[in-house]
Amino acid sequence: MIAIVDYGMGNLRSVEKGFLKVGVDARIVTDAASIDNADGVVLPGVGAFMDCIKNLSDMKLTEAIIKSIQKGKPYLGICLGLQVLFTESEEFGVCRGLNVFKGKVVRFPKMDLKVPHMGWNTLNIKKMPPIFNGIGGESYFYFVHSFYVAPEDEG
């Protein structure tokens, strides 16, 4: 069973429907025990970094998520669900993350680009991860975001 973590924000139903459509047993969960017992974890994300961290902490889910990752269970962080794995975010001042990965979540620099970044774009992938097996290298993905992760180790 894949645990889709409901921490009070996020696009839960669309993620759940996606898994069900491809025949994967995925359930929306709100407790640490369900995360511990799951074969993998999905943390969907829509909203502010600080609110996400506060909700995960208030619901006592942070430790279960970190332990699941440390055990090597598959983890899919969608947008904010990826960002909270990093050391900190500069959104609305500095806010500590789960520190699974060393690095920061930073706002796109002021340039001639529109922020938030919205629309269909390709990816510039340095090392192809297994999740992209069967997806063409020039595939398009939809984005709606104002921040990106800047890992300390880009490997």
Task: Please report, for each region that a protein language model flagged, where it lies by residue.
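Cysteine-nucleophile active-site neighborhood
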Residues: 47-119
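Structural alpha-helical scaffold elements that stabilize or flank donor/cofactor-binding regions
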Residues: 34-35, 68
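Pocket-forming structural segment of enzyme catalytic cores
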Residues: 89-155
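An anion/phosphate-binding loop that grips the pyrophosphate of nucleotide cofactors and donors
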Residues: 38
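Short glycine-aspartate micro-motif
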Residues: 4, 75-77, 141
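Structural motif
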Residues: 42-44
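N-terminal beta1-alpha1 ligand-phosphate binding loop
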Residues: 2-24
